[in-house]
């Protein structure tokens, strides 16, 4: 792909994207203790893409989204960085395709707001801290 900027000539920029039949790039998640410099791998299951990672309100916890290559199986995990433990909060599947958004908000009590098109329309859902649906 050529990149055009203010230079006289464009520059070529390449990026790796797996073609049909090729393996995906292997993506892993690691936690680093900045005091001890110890690095721990976080096991989020299958070799999925990790499109979104964000800190939750608790500074020891991360929210990690993974999605498979077909992009029809999305999982939301809670990762405790101190304990290096992972729990599944939410899983969505679709026969065709799941859109990845930035519509994830954690509230003060660790419940969270999530948007989904699971019924064909975009709706807002409220889940408790354990991933149980409270309200649409």
Residue ranges and their predicted role:
Residues 1, 78-80:
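Internal hydrophobic scaffold segments of catalytic domains
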Residues 3, 68-69:
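Intrinsic-disorder/low-complexity, polar/charged segments
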Residues 1-41:
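Predominantly five- to eight-bladed beta-propeller fold
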Residues 33-37, 80-84, 128-132:
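Short loop/turn segments that connect beta-strands within beta-propeller blades
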């Amino acid at each position: 792909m050529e990149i055009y900027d203010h230079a006289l000539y464009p520059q070529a920029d390449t990026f790796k994207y797996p073609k049909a039949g090729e393996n995906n790039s292997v993506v892993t998640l690691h936690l680093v203790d900045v005091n001890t410099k110890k690095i721990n791998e976080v096991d989020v299951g299958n070799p999925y893409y990790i499109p979104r990672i964000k800190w939750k309100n608790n500074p020891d916890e991360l929210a990690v989204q993974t999605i498979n290559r077909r992009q029809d199986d999305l999982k939301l995990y809670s990762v405790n960085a101190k304990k290096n433990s992972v729990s599944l909060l939410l899983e969505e599947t679709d026969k065709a395709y799941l859109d990845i958004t930035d519509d994830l908000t954690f509230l003060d009590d660790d419940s969270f707001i999530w948007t989904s098109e699971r019924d064909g329309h975009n709706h807002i859902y409220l889940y408790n801290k354990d991933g149980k649906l409270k309200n649409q």
